[in-house]
Amino acid sequence: MNEKIAILSAYSFVNIEEPANLIPKLLLIGKRKYVRGTILLANEGFNGSFSGSYENVNLVLEELIKLTGPKDVNVKINYSDVHPFQKLKVRLKKEIVAMNVDGLNVDLFKGEYIEPKDWDEFITQQDVIVIDTRNDYEVEVGTFKSAINPNTKTFKQFPAWVQQNQELLKGKKIAMVCTGGIRCEKSTSLLKSIGYDEVYHLKGGILQYLEDTQNKNNLWQGECFVFDDRRAVTDDLSPVERHWLQR
């Protein structure tokens, strides 16, 4: 029986002084361990998704943690019959998720996590609004029943949407959601920085929610868009193959 391919996604907002210096080290261990995928490095932290054997993707993650020294890392592992990535890339970026807002310190200043098991109960409270921080083409594929779609083409447009919708957000508990946690985490930092106090985000994102809850209350509708060769997954995390997902 062939071993399943492990797909590991990990991110952390942590100060990295010289991220460019880490690139050759990560490429070396990744290629030695036959790992494929993409790792983004920036002064604000790292964000990566890569595939290989379970042992090898964890060895690459261990090296990444050793080189960057984060206090905590958000990690998610799924499995596939094939590699969803073609090769290994390690890239230097200004931000690990581009918002184009200077001065955010997400590591120290962000909203509160809501565990997947508590999410359904939390978002059905009357004073809670849910904001899907993903792009509109992702939301089209699937989202939560009550979620607001900001109709953004890129994450860089999200800060402008917030500025234009302050009356909508005023006096509410704001619950952010995204695929794996990183965009909603950075979004909470933005909202906290401009004065919103009750800001929350789904820990581990939609993928962790679907794995932990199996969508038992049917608050999630549709599939979840993913940025690899699977294109989207169902609420049991099975890959979706449909012509309209070929972008």
Curated annotation (Swiss-Prot):
Catalytic activity: uridine(34) in tRNA + AH2 + O2 = 5-hydroxyuridine(34) in tRNA + A + H2O
Residue ranges of domain Rhodanese in the record: 124-218
Protein keywords: Oxidoreductase, tRNA processing
Domain of life: Bacteria
InterPro entries named among the record's database cross-references: Rhodanese-like_dom, Rhodanese-like_dom_sf, TrhO, TRHO_N
Active site residues of this protein: 178 (cysteine persulfide intermediate)
Top EC group: oxidoreductase
SS bonds (residue pairs): none
Gene Ontology biological-process annotations: tRNA modification
EC number per UniProt: 1.14.-.-
Family of this protein: Belongs to the TrhO family.
Functional summary from the UniProt entry: Catalyzes oxygen-dependent 5-hydroxyuridine (ho5U) modification at position 34 in tRNAs.
Protein name: tRNA uridine(34) hydroxylase
Species of origin: Rickettsia conorii (strain ATCC VR-613 / Malish 7)
Lineage of producing organism: Bacteria, Pseudomonadati, Pseudomonadota, Alphaproteobacteria, Rickettsiales
